[in-house]
Each structure stands twice: as structure tokens, then as C-alpha cells.
Design a protein with these regions (language model features):
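A conditional alpha-helix N-cap/helix-loop micro-motif detector
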Residues: 37, 68-69, 97-100, 137-140, ...
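Structural motif corresponding to the early beta-alpha repeats
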Residues: 3-102, 112-117, 218, 223, ...
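Surface-exposed cleft-lining segments at the edges of enzyme active sites
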Residues: 88-97, 123-136, 164-166, 198-201
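Short, structured loop/turn "capping" segments at alpha-beta junctions
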Residues: 114-120, 154-159
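Histidine-acidic metal/acid-base catalytic patches
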Residues: 1-7, 13-16, 25-26, 42, ...
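Histidine/acidic residue-rich metal-binding segments in metalloenzymes
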Residues: 103-111, 149
Length: 263
């Protein structure tokens, strides 16, 4: 809040820790893994409100398969308790739209009980021979819209990861995908990269054309938040200087918002 943000994104990646090679969960002292996970979510909400910011959206743990699935409902619960309206739940990278829809169909009744929309996201794989990203679920406009069409529910929307959309090999370009998604696009993950790797860097620091991105958002009358997913930028800061990094990130989001309003 002191950095200048007006909302916070509830990331729940550490809600569960699973050793895929051993086939078992790992010890986890994260409050979201405890029996008091809802109380923790309520506490975060109150801290935000006490400082003048609200939870706008969240991110469930991933990958969305097997033993992780039960935690996706917990993520929806926590989103509701924190005050968030959208929970991003990854599709399985390598399943079809029809196969991924089965998971979303299972989750949607509970999401509606919670009053939280589910957003799917554009993913990517990696082609080691070509040394570039490769197709994964929702990576193209056609795949993304197919996922949305199969589920066909007002509580199932799109979160476009701007960086993923710009990665060489899989992405179609963020501006193209924004226009293809239209009013189904209700959430964003914004970060910068070299249009090759998934860098999750601060906007305006690398190669993405944010003028084109913002123009496309304006063209579809986007009405959601400009939510950053640029935590890699903070890795260069120490605990003592992290506030400066947060201020930089907030300033980049404000710049995007100002660009949008100026059009």
C-alpha cells in the first residue's frame, strides 16, 4: 500500500508442496496448509483494508492435476474470504480443451457458492531442440477461446499472461490475443521479457511493446485491473531495499493505467 498499489493479488503457490518423483506431500508450515487457512485469509483481507487496499484476484497452486486438485477448492475458499473476485487456475498444459473442461466443470459449482470466478490462463511448454517455447493449453487465441467455449459459463473467464503471449515459439502476441478474447478477458498477468524467455520482469524494462498492448486493451474496453506478475524484479533487492522495488513496480502499473486513460 505504501508503494502506491490499490489492490493485492493473493498468490497461493505454497499452499501445498508435493514431491512428484516420490509421490507424496512434503512438510509444509505455510498457514494456508493448516486447518486455520480461512482465518489466515481473513487476516490478510483485514490487513489490506486497514491500509486502504483490497484483494482483486488470486492465483491457485499448480500444476492443476492429481493430488493438487483438492487444493484448488481451498484456493477458491481463500479467495472469497480475502475479498477477491477472480481466482486464476491453470489448465493442464498438455490436455485438450475438452479434458481441461472436466476439471473446471467440477470446480464451477463450488466457485459459484464462493462468489468467485475462475480464470484460465495461457500456458507454454519448451522445445529444447529449437530453444524456444512450444504450444501448451491456451497458448493461441484459438486454443484459449476453445477452452472458454467448451465450458461456456459466465463464471469462467480469461486471464491473459502478457509475457507468455509474447514468447517466441508459442505466443501469438499479446495485442492479437487481447482482441481475440474480447470481453472474456477479465484479468491480467503483466510483466516484461525479451520476447523469448519467461522473465517476469518489470514492465518497460525489456522488449514487449506495451503501447500496442494498452491500445488493444482500450479497443476491447477492458475494465479489469492492471495486475503485475513481475516478482523476478524484486530478486535484485535486499530486505532493506525491497520497498524501493515495490515502488518501482507500482509506478510501472500506474504508467500503464495512465497510458490506458489517455487513449
Amino acid at each position: 500500500a505504501k508503494a502506491g498499489f490499490d489492490a493485492w493479488d493473493f498468490s497461493m503457490f505454497d499452499m501445498c508442496k508435493y514431491d512428484w518423483s516420490a509421490g507424496c506431500f512434503l512438510p509444509n508450515d505455510n498457514p494456508l496448509a493448516s486447518d486455520n487457512y480461512l482465518a489466515f485469509a481473513r487476516r490478510l483481507k483485514q490487513i489490506g483494508l486497514d491500509n486502504g487496499i483490497l484483494c482483486n484476484q488470486s492465483h491457485a497452486p499448480f500444476p492443476s492435476r492429481g493430488p493438487i486438485i483438492p487444493y484448488l477448492k481451498r484456493a477458491l475458499e481463500c479467495t472469497a474470504e480475502a475479498g477477491g473476485k477472480i481466482c486464476i487456475i491453470h489448465p493442464d498444459n498438455y490436455l485438450s480443451a475438452q479434458e481441461n473442461a472436466e476439471m473446471y466443470f467440477d470446480l464451477l459449482p463450488f466457485a459459484k457458492e464462493c462468489g468467485v470466478k475462475i480464470a484460465t490462463e495461457n500456458m507454454w511448454g519448451w522445445d529444447t531442440e529449437k530453444d524456444q517455447s512450444s504450444f501448451a493449453a491456451c497458448a493461441t487465441s484459438a486454443s484459449f477461446n476453445e477452452h472458454l467455449d467448451v465450458v461456456n459459463d459466465d463464471f469462467f473467464v480469461a486471464c491473459l499472461d502478457i509475457g507468455h503471449a509474447e514468447m517466441r515459439g508459442s505466443g501469438e502476441g499479446a495485442a492479437n490475443m487481447i482482441r481475440a478474447l474480447g470481453n472474456r478477458l477479465q484479468a491480467l498477468h503483466i510483466h516484461d521479457n525479451d520476447c523469448w524467455h519467461d522473465s517476469h520482469q518489470i514492465p518497460f524494462s525489456m522488449s514487449i511493446d506495451f503501447d500496442a498492448v494498452v491500445k488493444a486493451l482500450k479497443d476491447i474496453n477492458y475494465s479489469g485491473y492492471f495486475t503485475l506478475e513481475a516478482s523476478s524484479y524484486l530478486e535484485a533487492f535486499t530486505p532493506e531495499t525491497t520497498q524501493k522495488g515495490l515502488c518501482d513496480l507500482a509506478a510501472s502499473a500506474k504508467r500503464l493505467s495512465d497510458m490506458f486513460e489517455a487513449l
